[in-house]
């Protein structure tokens, strides 16, 4: 609808005044020629990238990953760090639980020599560090592990048994208001790992809730619910777990999609097994009986052998991944590189059961 000349002049003057006072880009028309596509970072799982719709986790946003104990929350975030570092991005890990294992992180492909790490004393200190890193504009991905471990200063200085109603929720609410704008301006991805608690006296509906109040639920652009749904065995030995992730909230694509993948102890997400499954599903890989073939050449008998073939032939793995992303996401901007990096540990490293 056309605006009359007087209103147009008044609007132009107001916009000019706002840009003069607050800087260029502080206000604009939504349809202006400015990219609305959100840059993303791969989660390390192709099926989860597809479930997210945008091809990964969105930069400049807040993401919450929650689930029961030993469900793979920290493993998933370490895979995000590894994927970001392969793209030359700077990452930071705020270890509020004081439980980060650098040996395990290295096994997942994290360049620990270039990973910033902080073990804050209080929740306020952890969130101030996040804010300072975001405002610097030099850090691309920040992980906070976990919201439940962000203990308010008043609680630490008090005695065990003292009542501190709503302190953590108030601290998180204040931090979210401050962080959201700074993250958007700097394009920094902030991932909060969270734990599950049970609501007392819930007779109907889901009794589960997450810690830290409701502010994080509102400010998060993406919320992921991660669950361990089964064990992977070699003989009688458990070597990994079947994992399901549900996209509970998604502001950049359609929500409520699910992804299932394997997490192998000491190795992380079984990306090559995912490539085999998705390749067969979308007819890039042929399956005849137990044999798998790609472009007419047999690549292995059984899923495990086919996955090992792709692991040893990174060029073919990259090619299949690129085709799947083009087919299912319509882009290849954030495709990972499966060529082993120099900082990754040797194949013979002892596997470690660490979630």
Curated annotation (Swiss-Prot):
Q: What is its main location?
A: cytoplasm
Asked if the Swiss-Prot or TrEMBL record annotates the protein with the keyword Chloroplast, the reply is no
Spell out the InterPro entries in the cross-references.
Answer: AAA+_ATPase, DNA_recomb/repair_RecA, DNA_recomb/repair_RecA_CS, P-loop_NTPase, RecA-like_C, RecA-like_N, RecA_ATP-bd, RecA_C_sf
Q: Which GO terms describe its cellular component?
A: cytosol
Question: In which compartments does the protein localize?
Answer: Cytoplasm
Residue span of region Disordered? 331-355
Q: Where are the transmembrane segments?
A: none
Q: Which UniProt keywords apply?
A: ATP-binding, Cytoplasm, DNA damage, DNA recombination, DNA repair, DNA-binding, Nucleotide-binding, SOS response
What positions does the entry give for ATP binding? 67-74
Tell me a GO biological process for this protein. SOS response
Identify the CDD domains for this entry.
RecA
Q: Which GO terms describe its molecular function?
A: ATP binding; ATP hydrolysis activity; ATP-dependent DNA damage sensor activity; damaged DNA binding; single-stranded DNA binding
Q: Which domain of life is it from?
A: Bacteria
User: Gene3D superfamilies annotated for this entry?
Assistant: P-loop containing nucleotide triphosphate hydrolases (3.40.50.300)
- What does the UniProt function comment say about this protein? Can catalyze the hydrolysis of ATP in the presence of single-stranded DNA, the ATP-dependent uptake of single-stranded DNA by duplex DNA, and the ATP-dependent hybridization of homologous single-stranded DNAs. It interacts with LexA causing its activation and leading to its autocatalytic cleavage.
What protein family is recorded? Belongs to the RecA family.
Which protein, by its recorded name, is this? Protein RecA
Species source reads: Erwinia tasmaniensis (strain DSM 17950 / CFBP 7177 / CIP 109463 / NCPPB 4357 / Et1/99)
């Amino acid at each position: 609808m056309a605006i009359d000349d007087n209103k147009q002049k008044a609007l132009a003057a107001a916009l000019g005044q706002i840009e003069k006072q607050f800087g260029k880009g502080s206000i604009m028309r939504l349809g202006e020629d400015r990219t609305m596509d959100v840059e993303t970072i791969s989660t390390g799982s192709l099926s989860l990238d597809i479930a997210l719709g945008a091809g990964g986790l969105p930069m400049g946003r807040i993401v919450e990953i929650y689930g029961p104990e030993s469900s793979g929350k920290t493993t998933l975030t370490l895979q995000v760090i590894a994927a970001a570092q392969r793209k030359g991005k700077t990452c930071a890990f705020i270890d509020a639980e004081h439980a980060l294992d650098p040996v395990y992180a290295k096994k997942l492909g994290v360049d620990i020599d270039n990973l910033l790490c902080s073990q804050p004393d209080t929740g306020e200190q952890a969130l101030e560090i996040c804010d300072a890193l975001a405002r610097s504009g030099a850090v691309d991905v920040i992980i906070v592990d976990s919201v439940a471990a962000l203990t308010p200063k008043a609680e630490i200085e008090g005695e065990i048994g003292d009542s501190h109603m709503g302190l953590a929720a108030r601290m998180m609410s204040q931090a979210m208001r401050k962080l959201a704008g700074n993250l958007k301006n700097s394009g920094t991805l902030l991932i909060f790992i969270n734990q599950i608690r049970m609501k007392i006296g819930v007779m109907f509906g889901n009794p589960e809730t997450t810690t830290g109040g409701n502010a994080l639920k509102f400010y998060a652009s993406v919320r992921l619910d991660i669950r361990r749904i089964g064990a992977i065995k070699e003989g009688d030995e458990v070597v990994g777990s079947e994992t399901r992730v549900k996209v509970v909230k998604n502001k950049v694509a359609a929500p409520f999609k699910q992804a299932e993948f394997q997490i192998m102890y000491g190795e992380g997400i079984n990306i090559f097994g995912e490539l085999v499954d998705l390749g067969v599903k979308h007819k890039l890989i042929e399956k005849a009986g137990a044999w798998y073939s790609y472009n007419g050449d047999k690549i292995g008998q059984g899923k495990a052998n086919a996955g090992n073939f792709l692991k040893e032939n990174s060029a073919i793995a990259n090619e299949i991944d690129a085709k799947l992303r083009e087919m299912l996401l319509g882009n290849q901007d954030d495709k990972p590189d499966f060529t082993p990096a120099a900082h990754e540990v040797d194949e013979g490293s002892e596997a470690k059961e660490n979630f």
